[in-house]
Amino acid sequence: MARQLFKRKKFCRFTAEGIKEIDYKSVDLLKDFIAENGKIIPARITGTKARYQRQLTTAIKRARFLAFLPYTDQH
């Protein structure tokens, strides 16, 4: 009685929407890729391609530095 795992096909949101560059000022977009505790959600969970994951990480870090996003959930 092995338990069957259903794997959903992951897709990259940025290639589907045709986004070329991720901007650090689009806070609503960046919040979708941050967990409740403030950590960046990895690409293996979100399905984001490596190129966009690097852009996403850089944009989130810039937004944190400029105080558009909090570093943790306790701020």
From Swiss-Prot:
SUPFAM superfamilies per record: Ribosomal protein S18
Keyword set, alphabetical order: Ribonucleoprotein, Ribosomal protein, RNA-binding, rRNA-binding
Molecular-function annotations in GO: small ribosomal subunit rRNA binding; structural constituent of ribosome
Disulfide bonds listed in the record: none
A GO cellular component entry from the record: cytosolic small ribosomal subunit
Record InterPro entries: Ribosomal_bS18, Ribosomal_bS18_sf
GO biological process, one term: translation
Pfam families named in the record: Ribosomal_S18
SUBUNIT field: Part of the 30S ribosomal subunit. Forms a tight heterodimer with protein bS6.
PANTHER family: 30S RIBOSOMAL PROTEIN S18, SMALL RIBOSOMAL SUBUNIT PROTEIN BS18M
Family to which this protein belongs: Belongs to the bacterial ribosomal protein bS18 family.
Chain's role: Binds as a heterodimer with protein bS6 to the central domain of the 16S rRNA, where it helps stabilize the platform of the 30S subunit.
Protein name: Small ribosomal subunit protein bS18
Organism: Chromobacterium violaceum (strain ATCC 12472 / DSM 30191 / JCM 1249 / CCUG 213 / NBRC 12614 / NCIMB 9131 / NCTC 9757 / MK)
Lineage of the organism: Bacteria, Pseudomonadati, Pseudomonadota, Betaproteobacteria, Neisseriales
